[in-house]
């Protein structure tokens, strides 16, 4: 089967066009199905939920052994225990208990979703290919300056091997994240307005996402 390709410009860190590259449309320009993206984002966010909310039932609340007052003759409503959910300080009916919110989607759906998220950014014109991105030292100011030159106010940068210098340089600059190819996910793609692919990572992504 013949591959259909789209051609995009490759720029350097001075925002100058230095080359062109072909992207496989099966990965970077496919039909975007929002319900699949929604399911995968929901899966990712559910996996991060702590699930630690907990309340006590009437059995677990302290006290309540003795009947508060006799059944008849007081003029008050009958009561059997101070731990009743009707009482202030009593137990909670059907309250939350610690639980695992995570659920799984099959691998093929997850791969398709990453490809669709990349395609969405490509179709918007928000997918940028950078020839290389190297920093010799940890310099936040230099990183911020490069982002300004590239006209990127909010971006996810995907690299084959993110250097420690680069990762630490962007840490204190709001709106940016650097991920290795294997860490690329739907939530982070959709969270950022632009996606920057450093050129060598494209081959890795094509191998990973061809399903």
From Swiss-Prot:
Species annotation: Desulfotalea psychrophila (strain LSv54 / DSM 12343)
Family: Belongs to the universal ribosomal protein uL4 family.
Quaternary structure, from the entry: Part of the 50S ribosomal subunit.
Keyword rRNA-binding: yes
Segments of this protein annotated with the region Disordered: 48-89
Purpose of the protein: One of the primary rRNA binding proteins, this protein initially binds near the 5'-end of the 23S rRNA. It is important during the early stages of 50S assembly. It makes multiple contacts with different domains of the 23S rRNA in the assembled 50S subunit and ribosome.
GO CC annotations, alphabetized: ribonucleoprotein complex; ribosome
One GO-annotated biological process of the protein: translation
Molecular function (Gene Ontology), one example: rRNA binding
Full protein name: Large ribosomal subunit protein uL4
Primary gene name: rplD
């Amino acid at each position: 089967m013949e591959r259909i390709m789209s051609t995009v410009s490759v720029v350097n860190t001075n925002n100058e066009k230095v080359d062109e590259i072909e992207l496989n449309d099966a990965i970077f320009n496919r039909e975007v199905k929002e319900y699949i993206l929604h399911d995968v984002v929901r899966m990712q966010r559910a996996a991060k939920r702590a699930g630690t909310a907990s309340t006590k039932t009437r059995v677990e609340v302290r006290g309540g052994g003795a009947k508060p007052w006799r059944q008849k003759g007081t003029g008050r409503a009958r009561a059997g225990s101070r731990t009743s959910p009707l009482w202030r300080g009593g137990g909670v009916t059907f309250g939350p208990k610690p639980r695992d919110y995570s659920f799984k989607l099959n691998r093929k759906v997850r791969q398709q979703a990453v490809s669709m998220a990349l395609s969405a950014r490509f179709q918007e014109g928000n997918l940028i290919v950078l020839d290389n991105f190297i920093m010799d030292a940890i310099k936040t100011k230099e990183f911020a300056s490069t982002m300004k030159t590239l006209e990127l106010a909010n971006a996810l940068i995907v690299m084959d091997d993110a250097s420690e210098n680069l990762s630490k340089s962007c840490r204190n600059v709001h709106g940016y994240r650097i991920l290795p190819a294997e860490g690329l996910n739907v939530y982070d793609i959709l969270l950022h307005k632009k996606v920057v692919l450093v050129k060598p990572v494209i081959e890795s992504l094509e191998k990973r996402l061809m399903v």
